């Protein structure tokens, strides 16, 4: 029987359903929320996401990229806004054609759902909240929007219901998986930066206003407005709890983000009206039960958003699952275990790299030593493209396994420390000495590759 039930019709669940439908499976998608195509809100979730190589590869394999291209905006570099008004620029890639893309979560989800609706072997069900799961008898019970319960049987189940996954929690309650969700002490809130006031802000850039313990991030939209995300402690000094009235809010933004503040006419309404989102990392082991149930995406390995890889790693799940189904001729008893073994080490790696990037964006990004290392790293990639490709480039612009990219990054960190140790300016570099260090680096790199 080729029937699959997917819990969650967000980005990962819907793309996974499209992949499986292409293989001839009868797919049913159940979503707890209303159909996002008919809703004016995004349920308080992150509005803009970063689409890079891994996600693009997965979409391209389903012939979806040409349509997705129409709703995304290139981000070619970071624009770092200092409190004193200075702006510094840091390119993401090695050249102008290497960039990440800002895309609306709701627009992309709607596009995928429209594709699913056109697929004769996909059925979509909305307002169906998972109430219980009988994993041993393959029974599921949903609560619909009227409060009525609907029971169903399944042949094979995929949990793609995000970081707060009910499927994962129910597997945990049965003792089938071990799982935890670790929250950061910071949360985030979506705020808009008006297109009428963004003329002084570079287009096609990811805008960052990093401060000591908090940060404002801005993703560009197709209409030239910017979607801002304020990352702030939940409690204590400079926190969401502290900014509890309009006077404090205005003073905080005017002092910390003066150029953004001037472009935020709806700041008060949005700050006090929009929900505060949570930031968390999911640890889960294993991700499957026999050949009958599998977790993917954030439900299995949710991460904090500071490397822009949450959606990309979830889409990569879909692509790799499809490739394994090819390799093992749809033998799910083998596919589930191999998928977990292959992906777990890599998603653990991107979870760690995302946490490291969180610290980098918050504080390191303005450190003179860090800036020097980035300058040298970029020069290494330009001078020695066959020898040196940075960890960030490997993560964002290639499909190199995350674990390998992280191992290479650790090696590069040591190399950059050696190169930078005696200098304070890139002009002081002795490139003959650098080439000697690079030769040693190549030998160590060969063991990883």
Swiss-Prot record:
GO MF terms here are: FAD binding; kynurenine 3-monooxygenase activity
Q: Which Pfam families match?
A: FAD_binding_3
| Recorded catalytic activity of this chain's protein | L-kynurenine + NADPH + O2 + H(+) = 3-hydroxy-L-kynurenine + NADP(+) + H2O
Q: Could you say which residues form the signal peptide?
A: none
Q: Which UniProt keywords apply?
A: FAD, Flavoprotein, Monooxygenase, NADP, Oxidoreductase, Pyridine nucleotide biosynthesis
Under SUPFAM superfamilies, the record lists: FAD/NAD(P)-binding domain (SSF51905)
Q: Which family does it belong to?
A: Belongs to the aromatic-ring hydroxylase family. KMO subfamily.
Q: Which HAMAP family match?
A: Kynurenine_monooxygenase
Q: What does this protein do?
A: Catalyzes the hydroxylation of L-kynurenine (L-Kyn) to form 3-hydroxy-L-kynurenine (L-3OHKyn). Required for synthesis of quinolinic acid.
State the name under which the record lists this protein: Kynurenine 3-monooxygenase
State which gene encodes it.
Answer: kmo
């Amino acid at each position: 029987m080729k029937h699959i039930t997917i819990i969650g019709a967000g980005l990962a669940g819907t793309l996974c359903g499209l992949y499986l439908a292409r293989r001839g499976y009868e797919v049913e998608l159940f979503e707890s929320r209303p159909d996002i195509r008919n809703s004016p809100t995004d349920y308080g979730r992150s509005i803009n996401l970063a689409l890079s190589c891994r996600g693009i590869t997965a979409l391209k394999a389903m012939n979806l990229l040409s349509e997705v291209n129409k709703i995304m905006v290139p981000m070619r570099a970071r624009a770092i806004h200092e409190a004193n008004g200075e702006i510094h620029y840091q390119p993401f890639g090695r050249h102008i054609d290497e960039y990440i893309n800002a895309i609306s979560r709701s627009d992309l989800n709607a596009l995928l759902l429209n594709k699913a609706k056109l697929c004769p072997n996909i059925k979509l069900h909305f307002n169906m909240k998972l109430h219980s799961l009988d994993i041993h008898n393959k029974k599921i019970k949903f609560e619909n929007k009227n409060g009525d319960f609907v029971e169903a049987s399944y042949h094979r189940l995929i949990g793609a219901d995000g970081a707060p996954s009910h499927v994962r929690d129910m597997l945990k309650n049965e003792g089938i998986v071990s799982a935890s969700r670790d929250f950061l002490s910071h949360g985030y809130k979506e705020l808009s930066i008006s297109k009428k006031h963004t003329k002084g802000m570079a287009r096609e850039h990811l805008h960052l206003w990093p401060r000591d313990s908090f940060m404002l991030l801005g993703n560009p939209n197709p209409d030239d407005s910017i979607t801002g995300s304020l990352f702030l402690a939940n409690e204590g000094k400079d926190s969401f709890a502290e900014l509890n009235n309009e006077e404090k809010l205005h003073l905080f933004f005017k002092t910390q983000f003066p150029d953004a503040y001037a472009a935020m006419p709806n700041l008060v309404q949005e700050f006090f009206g929009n929900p505060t989102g949570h930031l968390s990392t999911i640890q889960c082991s294993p991700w499957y039960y026999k050949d009958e149930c599998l977790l993917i995406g954030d439900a299995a390995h949710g991460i904090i958003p500071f490397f822009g890889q949450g959606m990309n790693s979830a889409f990569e799940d879909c692509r790799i699952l499809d490739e394994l189904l090819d390799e093992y001729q749809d033998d799910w008893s083998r596919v589930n275990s191999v998928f977990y073994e292959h992906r777990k080490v890599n998603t653990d790696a991107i979870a760690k790299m995302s946490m490291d990037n969180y610290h980098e964006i918050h504080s390191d990004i303005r450190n003179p030593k860090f800036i020097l290392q980035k300058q040298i790293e970029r020069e290494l990639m330009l001078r020695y493209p066959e020898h040196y490709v940075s960890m960030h480039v490997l993560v964002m612009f290639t499909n190199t396994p995350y674990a390998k990219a992280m191992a290479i990054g650790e090696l590069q960190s040591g190399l950059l420390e050696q190169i930078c140790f005696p200098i304070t300016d890139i002009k002081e570099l002795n490139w003959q000495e650098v080439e000697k260090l690079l030769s040693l680096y190549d030998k160590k790199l060969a063991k990883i590759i």
